[in-house]
A protein has these predicted regions:
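Non-Sec secretion/translocation targeting segments of pathogen effectors
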Residues: 1-14, 182
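Active-site-flanking segments in enzyme catalytic domains
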Residues: 15-205
Length: 205
């Protein structure tokens, strides 16, 4: 989870940002259709064996496009990552999912991710595979937030860190403001929304 070094505009630094990410407008929705089509084309996921896992990834990409909005086209690949890392993004449109989880059967992958969640490491969700994809997509979105919005996320993060009554988040969200944002957006997609997830959504666009 989390971002590596890098940046740029879209795939390999040469992609295109969403011209209008506002999902409440017809222009914004049409733009998301274009970005989703490009993302699916760039993400054949040939090295993922179980079609159910592949379908979960594609569904996560589509639901994120419809609910949050892709900031640009995304290429999703599966490859080996360090032990314990579920995924990574370079901040420039490329997302890597760890084959240690995603190359397994859907049943085994979901069990391992669910066990991680039950151990208190990640947000509570009923779709752990999709939640991992949503988390990495949220890192890409965070990289495009304005400075003022990142400051607002930081302020919300400080409030969250002092909240002793919060439930369903897990330890990873406490790492820093960006991980808090990514976990919160993921939780808002397939978990139970709360005041923090709702506030993060309002800060997104």
């Amino acid at each position: 989870m989390g971002r590596g070094a890098g940046g740029g505009t879209g795939i390999g630094g040469g992609g295109s940002y969403a011209k209008n990410p506002n999902l409440s407008t017809s222009e914004g929705r049409e733009e998301q259709k274009r970005l989703l089509e490009l993302s699916n084309m760039l993400s054949p996921l040939n090295n993922i064996k179980d079609p159910k896992v592949k379908a979960e990834i594609k569904e996560a990409l589509e639901s994120y496009s419809k609910e949050i909005g892709l900031p640009y086209e995304v290429q999703i690949i599966a490859s080996d990552l360090a032990k314990g890392r579920l995924g990574a993004t370079d901040g420039g449109g490329s997302i890597t999912l760890n084959t240690k989880y995603f190359s397994k059967s859907a049943k085994n992958a979901e069990k391992e991710l669910s066990d991680r969640m039950k151990a208190g490491k990640g947000v509570t969700t009923n779709k752990p595979l999709q939640s991992t994809v949503h988390h990495e997509l949220a890192h890409n979105t965070y990289s495009k937030l304005s400075g003022a919005k990142k400051d607002a996320v930081g302020a919300l993060y400080k409030k969250y860190m002092s909240d002793k009554k919060v439930k369903g988040w897990g330890s990873y969200s406490k790492k820093n403001a960006e991980e808090f944002y990514a976990e919160g957006i993921a939780k808002s997609m397939t978990g139970k929304s709360d005041s923090y997830t709702k506030a993060l959504r309002k800060l997104t666009w």
